[in-house]
């Protein structure tokens, strides 16, 4: 795997609040190796370890992107949704940022059918076909299209299962994580001090509640993906 310097700065991580964990009463003992201190009832994450795991994750996604692999970024809580969409669009990744529908990956045939329906409705709307239908029929189809856009809008170009999944919040996205584990899809997961570091292929100890922390981690991963994609275009 290619090793590149990703300019992961500890001071910048502190400014982004990456090191702030949950309250000391709300923690998973498996996270003990990644916690450096307690401060005012809050666990503090060891940022040196975070930087190491983030660097490993960047190496992994760079290498995968340089070989044309596909990524899915999952983060559905309100604080993460906008950052997930922006990061995914920037790196041309698929994403889910509103709600994870059970079976999105493990029942791929159903998801694929929904995606085909979504694409057909989008094309119909673009060509003005919906406006030529009776008002009642058009209203029903437009409502279906709006719902599909909400839940599948970030996956509209997916034609198969992703090669790697990036998950922003282990607790919130537990169903998505379990589906990836079931299917053997490698996962990179942001884990706060209340998470289980053993569930993902690469776990990045970090504050998964603060927008600034989520954005910092995603920006590094997305930059690595973009660099990898550039390498793939130059040397296909």
Swiss-Prot record:
Gene3D superfamilies: Glucose-6-phosphate isomerase like protein, domain 1, Helix hairpin bin. Keywords: Chloroplast, Plastid, Ribonucleoprotein, Ribosomal protein. GO terms for biological process: translation. GO terms for molecular function: structural constituent of ribosome. It comes from the Eukaryota. It is found in: Plastid, Chloroplast. GO terms for cellular component: chloroplast; mitochondrial small ribosomal subunit. It holds the Pfam family Ribosomal_S2. PANTHER family: 30S RIBOSOMAL PROTEIN S2 PROKARYOTIC AND ORGANELLAR, SMALL RIBOSOMAL SUBUNIT PROTEIN US2M. HAMAP family: Ribosomal_uS2_B. Belongs to the universal ribosomal protein uS2 family. NCBIfam families: rpsB_bact. This is Small ribosomal subunit protein uS2c. It comes from Ipomoea purpurea. The gene is rps2.
């Amino acid at each position: 795997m290619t090793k590149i310097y990703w300019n992961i700065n500890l001071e910048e991580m502190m400014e982004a609040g990456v090191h702030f964990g949950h309250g000391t009463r709300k923690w998973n003992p498996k996270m003990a190796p990644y916690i450096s201190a307690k401060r005012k009832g809050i666990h503090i994450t060891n940022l040196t370890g975070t930087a190491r795991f983030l660097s490993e994750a960047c190496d992994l996604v760079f290498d995968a992107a340089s070989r044309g692999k596909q990524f899915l970024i999952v983060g559905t809580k309100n604080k993460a949704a906008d950052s997930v969409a922006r990061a995914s669009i920037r790196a041309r990744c698929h994403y889910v940022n509103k709600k994870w529908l059970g079976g999105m990956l493990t029942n791929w045939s159903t998801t694929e059918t929904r995606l085909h329906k979504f694409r057909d409705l989008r094309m119909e709307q673009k060509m003005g076909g919906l406006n030529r239908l009776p008002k009642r029929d058009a209203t029903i189809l437009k409502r279906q299209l709006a719902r599909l856009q909400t839940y599948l809008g970030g996956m509209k170009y997916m034609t198969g299962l992703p090669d790697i999944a990036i998950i922003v919040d282990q607790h919130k996205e537990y169903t998505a994580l379990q589906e990836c584990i079931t299917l053997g899809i490698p996962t990179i997961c942001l884990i706060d001090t209340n998470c289980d570091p053993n569930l993902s292929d690469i776990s990045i100890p970090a504050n998964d509640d603060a927008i600034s922390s989520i954005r910092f981690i995603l920006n590094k991963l997305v930059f690595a993906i973009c660099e990898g994609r550039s390498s793939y275009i130059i040397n296909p």
